[in-house]
């Protein structure tokens, strides 16, 4: 994170304020049988959503124009949870009357930093929320340890490789190292976020919440569209249900579909941050999704190998736009990736071998866990004595790493 000067704002009070306001805003459409007109109910829904969205937009833009502004932790996540709750109440006419239970949903501590974005209906269906069971706690602990290992032993270590590249300077790296950096950052972000999601699932299991899947082996995808159906699945489904489909989805012709997709992806970029590079990242993904939908999608389905290569080539490139905050720096990095008009590979030719040697275990481990068969085998056999012993080693080695390393917060906590 940047070096930030903390403002005199109590973020827990902000969250409590948002909960209270949302509880009050439910009243105009709590019961569909009440004698309120549809127009009035829509008005109050719009006011409710606007109040929540305004807070998020304010802090996203403040973080761009005021470098010393510290974002409230998890604001992107609990704001979306709040909006989804309000819309679901509007659609169903059923609201939660208990402020305590609603607060437990909005402030659910395992999910507050980086999600997943749970719907209220999922929590409402959790019949044993708050009920302790030893078997469930044991299963949850395994998820927590697996997530901790992903974060500490893979993501944080691969983050050092990306930090090395930034320290060297994009102008001074060779083309092979530029590609290694793109691959390392892609895996760092994945294991950091997927690791947190597993920890959240594990804690949720312990306290009786449903296991909400947020990742499904995205790097095994055969298109960018499929990749984002498997990556941060709760965010993707949120945009589908509360923005894309209400805009008309793909039901109003090709031009409207293209517009809806581009708008959704632009908003997705802004959700991650108000910086121009986030918006650009979202628009690039939107264009790729449109191109796949209109033209190349049918060709990707014909060749499993070529479609996988396409995803593994394109996705790391988009992550570079996501990771690098200024357009000039993005241009320099891409000039190193594609040295058609410059020295490229001739710059510092020994840097690739040096960095590769330092991070071989993490790169190999990351690649293995990106293979669906390997990951599913580990998940299926998580009660096997060998897997349990491996988790024991992972836990203590992770503790050792954390005790001897600088603090590395979860990357999505910044969003």
Q: What spans do the regions from the language model cover?
A:
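Membrane-embedded transmembrane alpha-helical bundles that form the catalytic cores
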Residues: 1-366, 370, 376-414
């Amino acid at each position: 994170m940047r070096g930030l000067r903390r403002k005199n704002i109590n973020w827990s009070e902000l969250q409590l304020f948002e909960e209270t306001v949302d509880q009050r805003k439910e009243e105009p459409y709590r019961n569909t049988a009440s004698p309120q007109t549809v127009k009035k109910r829509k008005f109050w829904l719009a006011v409710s959503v606007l109040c929540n969205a305004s807070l998020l937009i304010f802090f996203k833009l403040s973080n761009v124009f005021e470098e010393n502004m510290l974002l409230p932790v998890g604001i992107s996540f609990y704001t979306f949870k709040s909006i989804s709750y309000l819309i679901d109440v509007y659609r169903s006419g059923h609201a939660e009357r208990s402020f305590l239970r609603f607060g437990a949903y909005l402030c659910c501590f395992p999910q507050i930093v980086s999600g997943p974005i749970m719907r209220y209906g999922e929590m409402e269906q959790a019949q044993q929320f708050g009920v302790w069971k030893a078997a469930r706690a044991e299963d949850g602990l395994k998820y927590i340890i697996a997530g901790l290992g992903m974060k500490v032993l893979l993501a944080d270590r691969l983050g050092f490789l990306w930090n090395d590249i930034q320290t060297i300077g994009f102008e001074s790296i060779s083309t092979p190292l530029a590609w290694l950096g793109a691959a390392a950052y892609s895996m760092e972000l994945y294991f950091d976020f997927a690791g947190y999601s597993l920890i959240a699932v594990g804690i949720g299991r312990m306290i009786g919440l449903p296991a909400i899947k947020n990742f499904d082996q995205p790097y095994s995808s055969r298109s960018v569209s499929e990749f984002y159906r498997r990556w941060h699945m709760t965010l993707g489904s949120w945009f589908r249900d509360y923005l894309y489909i209400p805009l008309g989805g793909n039901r109003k012709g090709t031009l409207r579909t293209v517009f809806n997709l581009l708008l959704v992806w632009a908003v997705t970029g802004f959700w991650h941050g108000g910086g121009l590079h986030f918006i650009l990242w979202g628009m690039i993904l939107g264009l790729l999704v449109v191109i796949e939908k209109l033209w190349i999608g049918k060709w990707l389905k014909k060749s499993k190998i070529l479609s996988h290569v396409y995803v593994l080539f394109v996705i790391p490139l988009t992550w570079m736009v996501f990771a690098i905050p200024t357009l000039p720096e993005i241009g320099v990095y891409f000039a190193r990736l594609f040295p058609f008009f410059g020295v490229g590979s001739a710059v510092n030719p020994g840097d690739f071998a040096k960095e590769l040697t330092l991070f071989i275990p993490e790169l190999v481990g990351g690649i293995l866990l990106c293979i669906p068969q390997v990951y599913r085998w580990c998940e299926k056999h998580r009660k096997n004595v060998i897997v349990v012993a491996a988790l024991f080693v992972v836990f203590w080695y992770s503790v050792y790493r954390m005790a001897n390393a600088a603090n590395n917060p979860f990357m999505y906590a910044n969003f």
